[in-house]
């Protein structure tokens, strides 16, 4: 039997689900939850980032269109907009923050965040990226850099040890 696992399924499979369950229990995130679990909320929020969803409607419609493919990941049904909004407001964000740091520690320990080079630098190695983000002058009058254009300049310093800004 041939099994095709989606890229999103592989990403969710890399998350330590047992440590997520212990974080949910420790924070009491599902204390008043009736049908929409914290895991389903995490899946919805990761989906929104990867799909570049801009609204709750985009998230819910995108998950509804993929329901047959996401049911094996622990998401029973696509959430309603009001349910997702209520969960985003009332569930503690500390659960997801600790999940990020736990996952980052797991990947650092397993060596998944890059190969160790045969040489080492004496000082910290970082890359600098500079990007211009265009903005509409009618909405952001403070962002003028030309007479007819608006924008801001973003500088990001990326560490090569853990790939975090």
Give residue spans per PLM region.
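Conserved, well-structured functional cores that handle cations and Mg-NTP chemistry
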Residues: 1-165
């Amino acid at each position: 039997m041939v099994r095709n696992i989606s890229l999103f399924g592989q990403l969710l499979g890399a998350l330590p689900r047992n440590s997520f369950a212990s974080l949910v229990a420790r924070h009491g995130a599902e204390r008043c939850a009736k049908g929409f679990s914290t895991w389903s909320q995490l899946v919805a929020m990761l989906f929104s980032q990867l799909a570049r969803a801009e609204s709750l409607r985009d998230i819910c419609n995108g998950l509804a269109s993929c329901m047959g493919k996401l049911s094996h990941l622990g998401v029973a049904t696509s959430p309603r907009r009001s349910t997702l909004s209520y969960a985003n407001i009332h569930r503690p964000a500390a659960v997801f923050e600790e999940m990020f740091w736990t996952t980052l520690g797991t990947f650092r320990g397993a060596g998944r965040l890059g190969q160790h080079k045969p040489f080492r630098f004496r000082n910290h190695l970082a890359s600098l990226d500079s990007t211009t983000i265009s903005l509409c002058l009618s909405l952001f009058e403070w962002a003028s850099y030309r007479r007819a254009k608006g924008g801001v300049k973003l500088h990001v310093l990326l560490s090569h040890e853990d790939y975090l800004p």
